């Protein structure tokens, strides 16, 4: 199956509610796939695939309630969110949509969520979460959010052969290996910036010495 890249977002008329849900399903924005190293289900989310200009909050929430939430089961699970190539003009859902999705998640699912692995975070995403994370999400979710700068560190937590990752994510990961200064904002990743900034609070602490590229964001209480 080819999961390289969806067509670029364009200003098209809003689809019917049913067609919006079909579009989300076709693009495989959300997909329950594989397990983490603890044997728990993984919900993979590809940010680049999200058709932000073509779907409503209602369509997204209905899709999640009908297709995703029931299939997560009654056991703990993790989320792998691939942020590669997400931008405000095409596929960023916006504050209202993020809040709507969060509010629609059943409390039992929020309790069973073990970790959100945020792959390839950039400057804008970190600043956004540092600024609005406290307003959008409860502190419990913030504590479960872990930044992953390279795919190699994701595979320390998730079974590699069980989770599909689009080719453009691997391409960007390889580019970061050859241009490491992009992580720290010292080199441009034209046409999109890939830089590093501290997580939600001003202090940054590593989870442990062996897991140097994954950070846990702590929201301000």
Label every model-predicted segment.
Residues 1-221:
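Basic, amphipathic alpha-helical/coil surface patches used to engage anionic, phosphate-bearing ligands
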């Amino acid at each position: 199956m080819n999961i390289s890249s969806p067509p670029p977002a364009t200003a098209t008329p809003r689809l019917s509610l049913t067609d919006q849900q079909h579009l989300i399903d076709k693009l495989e924005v959300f997909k329950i796939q594989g397990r983490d190293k603890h044997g728990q289900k993984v919900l993979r989310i590809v940010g680049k695939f999200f058709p932000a200009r073509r779907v409503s909050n209602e369509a997204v929430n209905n899709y999640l309630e009908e297709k995703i939430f029931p299939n997560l089961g009654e056991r703990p699970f993790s989320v792998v969110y691939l942020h590669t190539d997400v931008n405000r003009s095409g596929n960023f859902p916006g504050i209202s949509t993020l809040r709507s999705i969060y509010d629609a998640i059943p409390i039992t699912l929020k309790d069973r969520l073990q970790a959100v692995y945020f792959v390839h975070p950039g400057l804008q995403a970190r600043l956004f979460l540092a600024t609005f994370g406290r307003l959008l999400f409860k502190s419990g979710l913030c504590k479960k959010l872990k930044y992953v700068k390279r795919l190699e560190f994701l595979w320390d937590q998730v079974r590699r052969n069980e989770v599909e990752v689009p080719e453009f994510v691997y391409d960007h990961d390889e580019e970061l290996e050859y241009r490491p200064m992009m992580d720290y904002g010292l080199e441009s990743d034209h046409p999109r910036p890939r830089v590093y900034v501290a997580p939600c609070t001003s202090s940054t602490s590593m989870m442990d010495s062996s897991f140097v590229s994954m950070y846990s964001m702590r929201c301000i209480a």
